[in-house]
Amino acid sequence: MTDYTTDIAVIGAGPVGIFTVFQAGMLKMQCCVIDALTEVGGQCTALYPEKPIYDIPGYPIVSGKELIDNLKKQSEPFNPQYLLGQIAEKIEDYSDYFLIRTSKGIVIQSKVIVIAAGAGAFGPNRPPIDNILDYENKSVFYQVKNISDFHNKNIMIAGGGDSAADWAVELSKIASQLYIVHRRRNFRCAPNTALQIDNLSQNGKINVIVPYQIKKLLGEEGKLHSVVVQNITNHEEITLQVDYLFPFFGTSANLGSMLNWGIEIKGYQMTVDFETCRTSRDRIYAVGDIATYPGKVKLILTGFSEAAMACHHIYHIVYPNSPLNFQYSTSKGIPNKN
């Protein structure tokens, strides 16, 4: 039994996946989008919704959330079907269409598959702290969705990479107290950010707790009131008053079942024809960070271009008897609005 029938099944609801919906729609092709996360936006939503992005054409500066909101709005006229919180587990090839089965048991019939999965399905690396699950999504978070929610709060950030350092700088602007806890004395971040942390520490805006690690969370009913940290050298323990904890230890990602789809993969990227973005398997395309070819530049704008190239090639599969007459959007407008 088929739950959905579509022209293109897009795997991945990040910026490139959403833009694929728009490009397909401009060519009168319908899309169904599958993503492991419960919200669209990929890493832009999950990891840096409020961090600035500077290299999107036409935007001197744009946040991850704003970019995703605008991409969704741009694609809305084409009525995409989003299947979130699930992964594409299995595909069956029936010569002129695929059946795609998701981890929730949903079956999609699609003429073509476009993989826009970035680095694959991913999630945060959870630190090995007892009872951390009791606090997750209440006072322990792995991303900052709305910075204003943490105004005048006592915040602890754990980690020493770019995400930890960047958010320490940003949240120090609105926090009552900001602690950053790291096992090492040096941060593995951009030199300019490390300098900012040093200056903010000297001015009392950030409390740098090194070389320490989190030992225990204290609170009740999911609400933190303090965190115990331990010195990794002399094992001294300190209890700090904390309202919210952000463990930033990176994310882990994998291609999962896609490794078994008969697609040529090199270093967790799919080799594609750079003119069409077709993979080694007919009617399966890859765009964005997951796609690789000689000279590939891993930028969001590169993925946008790849989405356009792939959709123009896919058109001939979806409409084999209808020639594609290229038109600029200024000439033809938005198909479903005319």
Curated annotation (Swiss-Prot):
Its EC number is 1.18.1.2. It catalyses: 2 reduced [2Fe-2S]-[ferredoxin] + NADP(+) + H(+) = 2 oxidized [2Fe-2S]-[ferredoxin] + NADPH. GO terms for molecular function: ferredoxin-NADP+ reductase activity; flavin adenine dinucleotide binding; NADP binding. FAD binds at D35, Q43, Y48, A88, F122, D289, T330. The keyword Magnesium does not apply. It holds the Pfam family Pyr_redox_2. Keywords: FAD, Flavoprotein, NADP, Oxidoreductase. The keyword Flavoprotein applies. Its cofactor is FAD. Binds 1 FAD per subunit. Belongs to the ferredoxin--NADP reductase type 2 family. Homodimer. This is Ferredoxin--NADP reductase. The lineage of its organism: Bacteria, Pseudomonadati, Pseudomonadota, Alphaproteobacteria, Rickettsiales.
